[in-house]
């Protein structure tokens, strides 16, 4: 009987989470401590970690994935049949790292369909990128031949290094009763051998029906096991998955694959060899992008060799309203061509982009008419860059359409004489193609073939790795202002907890810079509370000293990522001291520092039924008006006594302004980053 989530005992039972406490045949090993959290956080310099769930049908992979994610994402229920039928993934931010959990069906069962297993295995490997951890999920209780076959299959696919990068997760912990996990392992020869190979510090037990508090404890201890793995395996995590023949070998499915031929074999080592395509070859995702009316859909149809995407002339509305995709074979490879709506709509909702291209396109086709005014500073680039990062340029080919409009003109001469066009081509390192929609059938096939050959070269250049979607950047918020305006209370509101001392006193409460951290809506936030600028030693008469103090504050408290200065005032009480703070900042960092500031008023509750917009527009204070103008209206207000959803709403409003601030400057200029880098002594940038 198979189940995806059956865990035995009642959910409310409080079970002690058991880790193996001693090594079996390997001596004692130190347990990863909280002080070693940086091992997980840094993980060889990358900000993303992938966890691949592997195990037999009914082992509890989906339920375990949901426990790690802290939410029910993967379908998990009792069933005689396989519940998870394809690979799927979901991400969560944990301890400052983006963790992608990949759920899989049973990939290694001798009872499964070999063709389906091969397809699932290919999809699984296509989702992987370094670094990743193999999670072998196995239930406590009666073991079957399928448990052993799973271990053999993992070894066959991932090679002799599989043990080095494996963590074993035992599900149905509640079924241990009064027994220990170590005794359970000792009672099974294959389990004992497995744990001897990987080390007892890299196994843990889950009760996926435990209450929330107990599940959080389980996940915390599970993360400790990952930290221990990272301490043991520094540097590059895994060798490349491909064999010398570019094939995947040794799945333990009872068949051998070679091309499209299925051959019986007792070696249980399926092979997919050579560069040729078969039904299990991963698709090469090619994303068509551009403004409305540039001919993306028509270009897609030409590449596919058939009319599948809707095309028509329309001046008033978009023809392509949603993402759509179709595939074709070329040169024994499968290309998935993804048509997209007008690129300006992407900034409204990035979820569709991610859904249709996950984990990322292998190539981008930037479609634009040959005589267009598309320039390097166009908003098109900032939108793509925001989702995929600067690296998208290396994956992009410009596809110029409407060559027929320039009939009789030499293309090379035309591009060289057009400075904007020449600059655009240089940015993309000379990668471009041209389509003529009045071409003959033979000419059209030739231009499509040349383009696909270029795409193939881009894919090969990146070793078949896609341009993965950019994770959200960490945001550093540096609070500045005079003493008594509520900087510490504001910091506590942003963090959602009382991290900084905040009291009503005649003397300043905050005497030194300090920081706190939280994650909200998948964005990691570091809040830096600072003492009053005029309380910093020697800064009142020496602007250079103030610059030095703030630089030191950034170095000691900020983390890598974008940094935003928030100038805090108290609503209805703008004093000469506040004005002096602004003057000090402008004197130390040049007057235009205010262009990169956000103004935040505390005591929002004093507005009563009033509106912040009316307050800022109707104020008679000339200094405040000047500040609002220089900050380009980036103003918000906090009631630091709010709690729950009202508190979160305030924080999200500030984060929206902060992210929009960076985005607006990304779209229009990069020189300001150099200015601010110089302002803090060329030690750090405000946005990185």
UniProtKB/Swiss-Prot annotation:
Stretches the record annotates as G5: 207-209
One record GO biological process: regulation of T cell apoptotic process
Pfam family, one: AIG1
Biased composition annotated in UniProt, kind: Polar residues: 35-44
Positions contributing to GTP binding: 55-63, 76, 172-174, 208
Region spans: Disordered: 22-44
Region described as G1: 55-62
Segments forming domain AIG1-type G: 46-246, 281-471, 472-681
Keywords: Coiled coil, Cytoplasm, Endoplasmic reticulum, Golgi apparatus, GTP-binding, Mitochondrion, Nucleotide-binding, Repeat
Protein function: Exerts an anti-apoptotic effect in the immune system and is involved in responses to infections.
PANTHER family, per database record: GTPASE IMAP FAMILY MEMBER 8, GTPASE, IMAP FAMILY MEMBER-RELATED
Stated family: Belongs to the TRAFAC class TrmE-Era-EngA-EngB-Septin-like GTPase superfamily. AIG1/Toc34/Toc159-like paraseptin GTPase family. IAN subfamily.
Name of this protein: GTPase IMAP family member 8
Organism for this UniProt entry: Rattus norvegicus
